[in-house]
Amino acid sequence: NPVGQETVEWGVIGDEDPEFTNGSYAFAQKYEHDLDAWRALPTEMQEKFIGRRKFSDIELEDDEKDPAAHNVVAQDNRDDEEHKIVRMNVPFAQPGQGVRGTYFIGYARYWDVTKTMLTNMFTQNDKLLDYSKPITGMLFFIPSLDTLDAIAEGEL
């Protein structure tokens, strides 16, 4: 995740799209997880599949990761530059039905960055998807306050 000013740089539409400056694209997905299968894996395998240490969240060295680790394939590195999104996961559960998962939301300056990340996850066999199933997915455009004002005034 970007931090500080990078959050704005990667999460908010800039001057390149003047009609929508300060807006954002948001992509939301609901995933259900097979936690029994995940927990059956040794911690070392879980770390290889995610690409990070389980308890410290420190990124593994490239040679320690599975080639289809989540943090390897869920990237957009066009033109040798890492393109980022602002992301967040929130857990949910329906204990009576044994359902557990996360809601993912990502904010992006450019929708195609999120699209590329998702395409890579599904075409490069992201190891996380062996244990997580996407249930829903939605794309939203979030207008800036100026754009909302223009709509309210009948200018757009």
PLM segments and residue spans:
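Long, histidine/aromatic-enriched segments associated with O2/redox biology
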Residues: N1-L156
